């Protein structure tokens, strides 16, 4: 966690820029920062035949997609965009697991 100290004062947008400039440790920090959001969303959903860990994994995939696709020049904050990407990924997983 000591290595995360240098990221604590940075905005999400600055973190994304840092990651895109090659600082791979930033992704660990972002995952740690957003894990509670992912977990709270996983608690409110259900996958037939799955468990909350499956949804948490799907949520983390959504977070990775948010980091990959976020446009720092847009009006939406990264948090808002990540929240949407995480929710969509989880919702899609629920649909795929329950469809015949």
Set out the residue ranges of the language-model regions:
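Extreme N-terminal regulatory/targeting segments of RNA polymerase sigma factors
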Residues: 1-56, 60, 67, 71, ...
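Conserved small/polar residues in nucleotide/adenosyl-binding loops
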Residues: 97-100
